[in-house]
Amino acid sequence: MGISVPQVTVKILSTKLAESGPLLITHWGLSGPVILKLSAWGAKELAAFNYHFGIVVNWLHTYNESSLKASWSQLRKQYGSQKIGSRNPFALPGRLWNYFLHKCAISPEINWADLSAAQQSRLIKILTGQEFQVSGKTTFKEEFVTCGGIKLAEIDVNSMQSKIVPGLFFA
């Protein structure tokens, strides 16, 4: 079963493309509305990259790295005596929060107040800018990444009928 995150920001590296929205983590990889929007809007760029490119996921779309650093001392004060594994102040799904702790080599049993500066830095960085490499596309859902379509010059805009194939109408 996948994990859904209601609101993230995803940016395609080496482009100006970024979108915010719901993200789904599946056993296939990342999906959901934010990924599908990016693959639609960035179809030409993704094809030019031969579907090999990097993305950055900001799991806390309302923060960037510097704003989260600025808020961190307040979080430590507020949750200082609580175990970081059981106190997730960002409303992220539990399995995802535990993954971040593991990835940052942070024991879920450590109290918020006892996080080292290095641990804090790693956690802030992953929460606001985790990088992934995309290598290819799925064979289904190709319509989101292939730049297909019909030239407007080939459609009678009054009737929405094809000028090339009489009797073929578009909605």
Where are these regions (language model features)?
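A glycine-rich dinucleotide-binding beta-alpha-beta segment and adjacent secondary-structure elements
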Residues: Y99-A171
